[in-house]
Amino acid sequence: MAEMKTSPSQDEEAGVVAMQLATSTVLPMILKSAIELDLLNTIAKAGPGNYLSPSDLASKLLLSNPDAPVMLARILRVLATYKVLGCKRGEVEWLYCWTPVCKYLSNNEDGASIAPILLVHQDKVTIKSWYHLTDAVRDGGTAFNKAHDMSIFEYASQDPQFNKAFNRSMRGHSTITMKKILETYKGFEGLKSIVDVGGGTGATLNMIISKYPTIKGINFDLPHVVGDAPSLPGVEHVGGNMFASVPKGDAIFLKWIFHSWGDEECLKILKKCHQALGDNKKVIVAEFILPEDPGGSDSATKSAVHLDAIMLAYVPGGKERTEKEFESLAKRAGFKSFTKVCCAFNTWIMEFSK
């Protein structure tokens, strides 16, 4: 095999990158500890530009371990290296502060954060899946199912703690993403009713109804999911199976649903949606869109391919899709038109019109 020619400095840099990849479990596990210790929320509460030392943080977190400041300093150093925190030299210790990335990993004014997503993907339940990915590639099947002898949806229905953690992660993402979507997307205007298929505990629908209070909202998900849902004004929680039927409405909203299923399952869901809609009504889809070129290295591309790999490990047939693949699904399900409308935090809004 021909070797790619590189200069000595490029070759050394490649070796350093390879070493970083070899130790890449460090960052998510450090973040997990920082979140569990409430480190990021504590730094965020201090506000932008206000620096705290490891000793300050150990005191604020009421850590009795005498070695805690030194241990925190090492955790903080990792986070500063990845721009999760800012830093500057103090008289005795390095000092650390909030950054825009930290903003999304700590609770915002709505109490929402991306942190629960990180925690659910570093949970022992999901981590166990990755130890079975190699066997899944060799022998077929899905890593999560091999690890637990059941699907992730079946597991969630039987493990209340994991179910709550999973729902919390979806709630946080929905709150942050939908707030941005509602600032730019105008497709909810004029609707009399909307059905959120796979709407979890209703966080997304609650935000839509809060902005458009004349809309009747139906939050539709599996019975064990809506059973964990709070009472919300203007929202009716309905338990059921989207493969059997979907409640009728002026529009049907699906956020992060299709990436959990293969093409044939997505077609079944879309056809049920098509049946539930009147003429000239629409399905509103919110999903990541994979770029056509797999060689991109920007944050949006990496985030999308990370989620695609998660679907590979967790869900039979689950995957992220390109724009062309979404358009093909829409047309095959009988929808007349497909429109990519707007984007918020890498989640695209698409309309499939009947």
From Swiss-Prot:
Any one of the GO BP annotations: methylation
Binding-site residues, bergaptol: 121, 259
EC category: transferase
Record gene name: BMT
Record-given protein name: Bergaptol O-methyltransferase
Residue sites binding S-adenosyl-L-homocysteine per the record: 174, 198, 221, 255
Means of activity regulation: Inhibited by Cu(2+), Ni(2+) and Co(2+).
Keyword Transferase among record annotations: yes
Active site: 259 (proton acceptor)
EC assignment: 2.1.1.69
Coiled coil: none
Catalytic reaction list: a 5-hydroxyfurocoumarin + S-adenosyl-L-methionine = a 5-methoxyfurocoumarin + S-adenosyl-L-homocysteine + H(+); bergaptol + S-adenosyl-L-methionine = bergapten + S-adenosyl-L-homocysteine
Organism of derivation: Ammi majus
PANTHER family the UniProt entry points to: O-METHYLTRANSFERASE
Keywords: Methyltransferase, S-adenosyl-L-methionine, Transferase
